[in-house]
């Protein structure tokens, strides 16, 4: 679905319906699978925990399994840090991953109700997240919301509004 490449030629690929994380492929020998990177975790509500504690094994087997969400988009900055956005992951929809796959944004980002569609970074380490509804959210590198702009175009084709966002990029200035 989405792919970024670091300075060493290592590819990071978001694969549809893959719950193991981002696929990491080395350029060695025509492409060597290195493993998975930046895995999302499945969140479980208190209600689900209580249900599972009181249900029989047969009833639990019929419950929907709790699988982690697949990232929807990713980006890489000049330092090699990987950024991902994931729909349906309330507290960790935006991640800033180091080389070990550890999220550097502590506490998660939950400043918006929209579905994140794309992510990129700017020259000052700011992070830009575009929602599928046309809003652009700008965060600092710690994941603190700086401001929101844009919106959904209602057919009037006004400047700064979008009907559906699929990617985002910022210029070098």
What function would you assign to each model-found segment?
Residues 7, 18, 70, 90, ...:
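Beta-rich catalytic cores
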Residues 26-30, 97-102, 140-144:
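Short loop/turn segments that connect beta-strands within beta-propeller blades
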Residues 5-8, 76-79, 121-124, 170-172:
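Residue-level detector of Asp-centered blade-edge/turn motifs that repeat once per structural unit
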Residues 10-13, 81-84, 126-129, 137, ...:
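Conserved beta-propeller blade signature
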Residues 8, 16-18, 27, 79, ...:
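Short loop/turn segments immediately following the C-termini of beta-strands
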Residues 19-22, 31, 91-94, 135-137:
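Structural signal for beta-propeller blades
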Residues 1, 30-67, 102-112, 146-160:
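Surface-exposed loop and turn segments in beta-propeller and other repeat-based domains
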């Amino acid at each position: 679905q989405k792919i970024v490449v670091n300075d060493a030629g290592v590819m990071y690929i978001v694969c549809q319906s893959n719950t193991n994380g981002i696929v990491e492929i080395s350029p060695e020998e025509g492409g060597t699978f290195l493993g998975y990177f930046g895995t999302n975790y499945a969140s479980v509500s208190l209600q689900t925990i209580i249900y599972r504690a009181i249900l029989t094994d047969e009833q639990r087997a019929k419950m929907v399994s709790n699988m982690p969400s697949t990232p929807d988009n990713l980006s890489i900055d000049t330092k090699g840090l990987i950024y991902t956005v994931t729909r349906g992951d309330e507290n960790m929809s935006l991640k800033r991953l180091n080389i070990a796959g550890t999220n550097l944004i502590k506490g998660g980002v939950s400043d918006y109700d929209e579905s994140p569609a794309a992510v990129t970074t700017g020259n000052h380490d700011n992070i830009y997240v575009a929602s599928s509804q046309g809003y652009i959210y700008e965060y600092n590198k710690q994941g603190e919301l700086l401001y929101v702009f844009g919106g959904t175009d209602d057919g009037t084709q006004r400047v700064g509004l979008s009907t559906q966002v699929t990617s985002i990029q910022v210029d070098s200035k």
